[in-house]
């Protein structure tokens, strides 16, 4: 039996159908927002997965090209691997949902979102976030929801709830906020240097809207919700845990984790595990639980140190940033490079400049964006954490971190008109102990400036963490969290920005939400840290972008022609443009508006190519002198090619002021000559006079 529920959301109708499709899933919501349609399902395995110490949640956001009336390309004509946008949407759906499942739940859970129709005015990503929350809430899967999500834009100083595609194009803010009944559980934002107080206002505006959505979801759950099923609770044997704590002692564990060197700490923990392996060698059941038990003991120890003793594992104050170092020009022949280090986290970013034709082409369901001029790629090799594993290409985490850094830097990049280059930055993680994504933002900002990209302002990033106690007021916020504080803490609140304001936020938490007080304090803390990094570390290295691109970067000049003359520049089967390229060695890109980009490391060759193009598209003026080549000789004169599409004739009487008996006495085929235009007759024929021969 199908049941329908609807509400007005930002001037459009959100309609949810339950029972119409996918009845065999644990929960299914057929979502309609405007003309956007997404099927969201939640399914769980009947039994827990053996041998794991984590909750196995998978989230899939599937973009079907039929949703926008397109047929996939390629030989198979089927959708291939997920797009970058789909992977990022998977992650943004996952983040508010994961903390609300029981921590000891080991059944496989899959949240699938099938995008079936796309209305550009109604975000399919937001629809999928709401759909996953509803499908899980009405299912029998244990879940402490519901959650609700809202997008906020900022146009001319006014907030816009769930902006349309057209509004997003002119918005200074792209904010997504997910909430529970009382608290904010997820924040993701890209912004054009939005001040901190405006960002906070937008976050809490979204939280208010989310409360109305949660009331709507409650009505659906009340009518369609299933009773949550019982499950096998996965816990470490209490007797084993108590024996371990008594044997190792809390003091010894605190001593093991209290060091500013990651490898020393890992060696200390491994030594503890070896002692336990020896102690429990005869008890297979306890032996199998050592890893989880030691992890839990570490976590309890670290959280107590921070919360009760205000002591961090590496000895820092709660507001103290790890030692910082920055430098530029690390690599000799690249277009731009920089190294940024924060404690034992080290990132090198390399910038490469290319023609706009090298921008990334996007083939997905977003028909408003078909190319991406700025690309940020993030690589996290195994050696950065002292491990050995084969490289299989970027995973979801690497794609997500790259996108976060990209989002943080896009607002300060120059326009195509100001800087007609495609730009790629690659962040190579050399060493990792937490906050590599924020390190890549700092390194990339430095690298861009070193490459001569005229950014509006340098950008820095920082991550703050959180350890909570029993009540809402019992917490400690940590500036610049290292890996251990990320693993055992409750929050990873990443913020990037300039002196002027915020350019990106990404908030991940492991608890059931944050109070307004914590969010305000966290953003204030990031502002302090960003100011310190910019002024005390980055600016002394390179305070602003260089006024020229690097020695080995291509130079670009632009020249605009009448679009109707594009065919003249290209020539039949590309003969003309290829001739220019062969003669000058430049790279030429022409777009349909008539803009021509000419690239080369040699400015003289760029100038020569422009001169040739001008000779093709610009009309000849009577009385002006032009250079050309003699291409044909007749008994009455010589024909001179002035450009690929223009030639004229020098009558034998105009070859010299003296009488000429034979044309070949003055010029021959292949001679370079300077000629004056005497006349362009009604038929377009060009009559010339020889001024001089040009010697090689």
Stretch-by-stretch model annotation:
Residues 1-232:
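Long, basic N-terminal domains or extensions that often function
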Residues 1-45, 53, 229-369, 554-568, ...:
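Extended amphipathic alpha-helical scaffolds
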Residues 25-110, 115-117, 122, 188, ...:
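Glycine-rich, flexible beta-strand/loop modules in the N-terminal catalytic cores of phosphate-handling
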Residues 27-29, 122-140, 328-351, 433-453, ...:
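Conserved phosphate/anionic-ligand binding catalytic regions in large, soluble enzymes, centered on
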Residues 33, 42-44, 61-63, 113-117, ...:
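Flexible glycine-/small-residue-rich
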Residues 103-109, 144-146, 213-231, 263-264, ...:
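Flexible, glycine/charged-enriched surface loops at secondary-structure junctions
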Residues 142-257, 448-547:
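Mobile "lid/hinge" segments at catalytic clefts and subdomain interfaces of large enzymes
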Residues 290, 552-558, 563-696:
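Single-stranded RNA-binding regions, centering on S1/OB-family and related RNA-binding modules
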């Amino acid at each position: 039996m199908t049941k329908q529920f609807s509400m007005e959301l930002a001037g459009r109708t959100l309609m949810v159908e339950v029972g119409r499709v996918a009845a065999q899933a644990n929960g299914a919501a057929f979502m309609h927002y405007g003309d956007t349609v997404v099927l969201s399902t939640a399914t769980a395995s009947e039994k827990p997965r053996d041998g794991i110490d984590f909750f196995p949640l998978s989230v899939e956001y599937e973009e079907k090209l039929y949703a926008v009336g397109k047929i996939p390309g390629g030989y198979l004509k089927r959708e291939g691997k997920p797009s970058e946008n789909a992977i990022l949407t998977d992650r943004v759906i996952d983040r508010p949902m994961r903390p609300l499942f029981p921590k000891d739940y080991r059944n496989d859970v899959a949240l699938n979102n099938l995008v079936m129709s796309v209305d550009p005015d109604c975000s399919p990503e937001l629809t999928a976030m709401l759909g996953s929350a509803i499908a899980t809430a009405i299912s029998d899967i244990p879940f402490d929801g519901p959650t609700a999500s809202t997008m906020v834009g900022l146009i001319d100083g006014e907030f816009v709830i769930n902006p349309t595609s057209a509004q997003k194009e002119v918005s200074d803010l792209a904010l997504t906020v997910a909430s529970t009944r009382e608290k904010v559980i997820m924040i993701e934002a890209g912004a054009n240097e939005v001040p901190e107080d405006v960002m906070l206002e937008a976050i809490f505006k979204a939280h208010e809207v989310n409360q109305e959505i949660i009331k709507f979801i409650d009505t659906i759950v009340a009518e369609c919700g299933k009773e949550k099923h019982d499950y096998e609770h996965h816990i470490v044997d209490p007797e084993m845990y108590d024996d371990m704590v008594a044997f190792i002692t809390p003091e010894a564990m605190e001593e093991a984790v209290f060091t500013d060197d990651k490898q020393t700490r890992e060696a200390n923990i491994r030594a503890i595990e070896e002692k336990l392996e020896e102690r429990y060698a005869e008890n297979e059941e306890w032996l199998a639980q050592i890893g989880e038990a030691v992890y839990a003991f570490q976590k309890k120890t670290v959280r107590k140190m921070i919360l009760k003793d205000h002591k961090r594992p590496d000895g820092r104050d709660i507001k103290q940033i790890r030692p910082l170092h920055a430098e530029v020009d690390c690599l000799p022949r690249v277009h731009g490079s920089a190294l940024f280090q924060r404690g034992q986290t080290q990132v090198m970013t390399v910038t490469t400049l290319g023609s706009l034709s090298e921008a990334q082409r996007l083939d997905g369901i977003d028909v408003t964006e078909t190319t991406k001029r700025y690309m940020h790629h993030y690589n996290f090799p195994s050696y950065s954490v002292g491990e050995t594993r084969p490289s299989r290409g970027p995973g979801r985490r690497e794609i997500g971190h790259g996108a976060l850094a990209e989002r943080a830097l896009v607002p300060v990049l120059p326009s195509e008109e100001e800087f007609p280059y495609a730009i790629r930055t690659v962040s190579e993680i050399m060493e990792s102990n937490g906050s590599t994504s924020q390190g890549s933002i700092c390194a990339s900002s430095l690298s861009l400036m070193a490459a001569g990209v005229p950014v509006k302002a340098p950008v820095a990033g920082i991550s703050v963490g959180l350890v909570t106690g029993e009540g809402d007021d019992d917490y400690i916020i940590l500036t610049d969290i290292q890996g251990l504080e990320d693993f055992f803490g409750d929050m990873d609140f990443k913020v990037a920005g300039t002196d002027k304001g915020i350019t990106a936020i990404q908030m991940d938490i492991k608890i059931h939400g944050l109070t307004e007080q914590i969010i305000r304090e966290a953003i204030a803390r990031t502002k302090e840290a960003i100011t310190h990094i910019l002024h005390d570390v980055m600016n002394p290295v390179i305070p602003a972008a260089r006024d020229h691109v690097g020695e080995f970067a291509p130079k670009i000049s632009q020249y605009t022609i009448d679009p109707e003359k594009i065919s003249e520049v290209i020539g039949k089967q590309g003969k003309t443009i290829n001739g220019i390229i062969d003669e000058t060695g430049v790279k030429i890109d022409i777009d349909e508006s008539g803009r021509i980009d000419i690239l080369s490391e040699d400015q003289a060759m760029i100038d020569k190519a422009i001169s040739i193009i001008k000779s093709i598209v610009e009309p000849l003026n009577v009385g002006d002198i032009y250079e050309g080549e003699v291409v044909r000789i007749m008994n009455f004169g010589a024909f001179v090619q002035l450009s690929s599409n223009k030639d004229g004739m020098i009558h034998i009487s105009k070859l010299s002021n003296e009488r000429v008996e034979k044309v070949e006495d003055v010029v021959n085929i292949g001679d370079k000559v300077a000629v004056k235009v005497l006349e362009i007759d009604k038929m377009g024929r060009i009559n010339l006079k020889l001024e001089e021969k040009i010697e090689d």
